[in-house]
Structures are given as structure tokens and as C-alpha cells.
Amino acid sequence: MTKRTSAKYKIDRRMGENIWGRPKSPVNKREYGPGQHGQRRKNKLSDFGTQLRAKQKLKGYYGDLTEKQFRKIYAEAERVKGDTGEMLVGLLERRLDAIVYRAKFVPTVFAARQFVNHGHVTVNGQRVNIGSYRCKEGDVIQVRERSRQLAIVLEATQLAERDVPDYIEVDYSKMTATFVRTPSLGDVPYPVVMEPNLVVEFYAKN
């Protein structure tokens, strides 16, 4: 197991939820956190604890973003007119690594970030190697031709059930994904309940 895979499962255990819906997640077998104290009985969370957990879960889902990265995205969402929680989700889903993951070009969001960082994708014909690159509606993301035979890509794209959300249009014959529109919270296929409203409450008080 790679360090990144181990870290991913540690996030699941810390949250006590299978946040990516993976069949091999350890929380499918045990419902306590990582470490020697993980099996202690969980106390009911305070409002602060509930809000913090909501933030950590959303931050972890997108590849365990650092607090600095996540706080910057939140600050941008806060400046946009509208519901801050909805804006936050929309900005997160516009990340290039998130779109590569949603398009099922690779199996995990961690793999998507690495895939982008290694220069395997283009946006509107130009190579982009920054996972946090923010896509716009109408942008066309494509796996470079020389990268299409990589084992990680073949494994992901040959899955019988792809379940790509409708705000992304995928053409697997060309290995392209068109970002159609910015989604709202209800559009995003999270395997677990995400509560960006609690993230807003957390930052409002801290």
C-alpha cells in the first residue's frame, strides 16, 4: 500500500465514514478512528466539533487539502454573491483534479492530482499541470494521447459503471471531458452527506 493510499484510508478512519464510497475502505469493517486510542467510545460532538468535522470531511474529500488552500477557496466563495456554502462546493468542483476524477479518467482524487501534476492532461488544447487550476464552463479537458494507455487510465475507464455527473460531458473515444456548468450541492455525487453550511458556521465563529 502506498503512503498516499494509506493516508486516504486514514482520513476515512478519522472521519468514521467511507467518504469516497470505496469498497476497500477500513471503515466498512470498523467504525473507530486511527491510532491506539481510536477504539474509545465517541462522545457527542459539540457544535464546534460538528462544524470542525464538516470542514475536515469536505477538505479531506478533495484530496486532503491543506488548511491554507481550503481557507483561500472559502474566502473566494465568501466574496461571491449568493449562498457561501453552495459557492464553496462550486469552486471545489471546478478544480481540474476534481473534474479529472469526476470524469473517471483515474480511480481516485489523489490519483487525479498526481495525473494532472505529471502533465497528462490538457485544457482547451494547452497542457496544464496544476491540480488546483480552475476550469470555466465550456472548457474541454483531455487526456493526452500518449497517456491514454497508462494502466491507471485503462483500469478506470473500463469500469462497467461510470456514474459521471451531468455537469460534465465525457467522450471516452476521445478521452475528453467538457465542463458544462458549475454544480450546486445537490448535483454533486458525494457518497456521504456533506454540510458546507456547517463549514460556513465554523469560519464565521473562528
UniProtKB/Swiss-Prot annotation:
Statement: the UniProt record of this protein carries the keyword Ribonucleoprotein: yes
Single GO biological process annotation from the record: ribosomal small subunit biogenesis
Highest taxon above the source species: Bacteria
GO molecular-function terms, A-Z: rRNA binding; structural constituent of ribosome
InterPro entries: Ribosomal_uS4, Ribosomal_uS4_bac-type, Ribosomal_uS4_CS, Ribosomal_uS4_N, S4_RNA-bd, S4_RNA-bd_sf
Pfam families xref list: Ribosomal_S4, S4
SUPFAM superfamilies noted in UniProt: Alpha-L RNA-binding motif
Segments of this protein annotated with the region Disordered: 15-46
Keywords annotated in UniProt: Ribonucleoprotein, Ribosomal protein, RNA-binding, rRNA-binding
Domain S4 RNA-binding intervals: 94-157
CDD domains (UniProt xref): S4
Gene Ontology CC annotations of this record: small ribosomal subunit
Coiled coil: none
Gene3D superfamilies xref list: Ribosomal Protein S4 Delta 41, Chain A, domain 1 (1.10.1050.10), RNA-binding S4 domain (3.10.290.10)
Cleavable signal peptide: none
Subunit and interaction comment: Part of the 30S ribosomal subunit. Contacts protein S5. The interaction surface between S4 and S5 is involved in control of translational fidelity.
Function according to Swiss-Prot or TrEMBL: One of the primary rRNA binding proteins, it binds directly to 16S rRNA where it nucleates assembly of the body of the 30S subunit. With S5 and S12 plays an important role in translational accuracy.
UniProt family annotation: Belongs to the universal ribosomal protein uS4 family.
Protein name: Small ribosomal subunit protein uS4
Native source species: Cereibacter sphaeroides (strain ATCC 17025 / ATH 2.4.3)
Record gene name: rpsD
